[in-house]
Amino acid sequence: MKKPVLVVMAAGMGSRYGGLKQIDPVDKEGHIIMDFSIYDAVQAGFQKVVFIIKKENEADFRSAIGDRLSNQLEVSYVFQDLHNIPEGYEVPEGRVKPWGTGHAVLSCINEIDGPFVVINADDYYGSHAFKMAYDFLTSEEKDEDVYHYMMVGYRLENTLTENGHVARGVCVTDEEGHLIKINERTHIEKHDGGTAYTEDDGKTWTMLPEGSVVSMNMWGFSNSILK
């Protein structure tokens, strides 16, 4: 069975941070969040990472991030091109923001020939998440044409911050833990009575139950998703 590949969506990093060289380290040794994700992934069993980046950021990304990781695992790069879309679709005039997760994954089609896990470049997932994802995709021999997919979910209260609001995908699952749908909530905050979200700039708030499962955008797929 082919080993799972880690796919890291990093095409938006430059715009969010004002350039790759401005990414703030999170410890005294100069590590960034992605360093911890790569370490945890390697410990879980991953041996290859594919970085999805913008073509114009390639040199900076290699020197700031990619080259120093190449002694830990195989490193590949693909480019998320705004205009690389399926036939029959058009890019809206004036759009410069990269498309979402689905388009990012489509960019990897020539680099992945087996199962894979997709994460954001700038979110912290924890070592247990990578182990769960890897084990799910390697637990037994599976037909790569079968829709064998997963998402790592988190308890909402464990993903909040004391410094403002967060955006999270609130999951709806059935009794067996199967994902039915995700409701995107772009403004979630802690309140005295619990956790709530607003969709009208704070005029009204809707409480979210304690223990709600949310997505941090960590997905695992068999290769069938690319066929």
Predicted segments — roles?
Residues 1-14, 28-120, 125-132, 139, ...:
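Conserved N-terminal catalytic core of the sugar/cofactor nucleotidyltransferase
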Residues 9, 120-121, 152-155, 221-222:
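A secondary-structure boundary/capping signal
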Residues 19-20:
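Conserved catalytic-core motifs of eukaryotic protein kinase domains, centered on the activation segment
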Residues 24-26, 30, 112, 134, ...:
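Generic secondary-structure boundary signal with a strong preference for alpha-helix termini
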Residues 53, 220-221:
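A conserved hydrophobic position in a structured secondary element of the catalytic/binding core
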Residues 127-219:
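Conserved core of the sugar-phosphate nucleotidyltransferase
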Residues 224-227:
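Aromatic-glycine-rich donor-binding/catalytic loop that engages nucleotide-sugar donors
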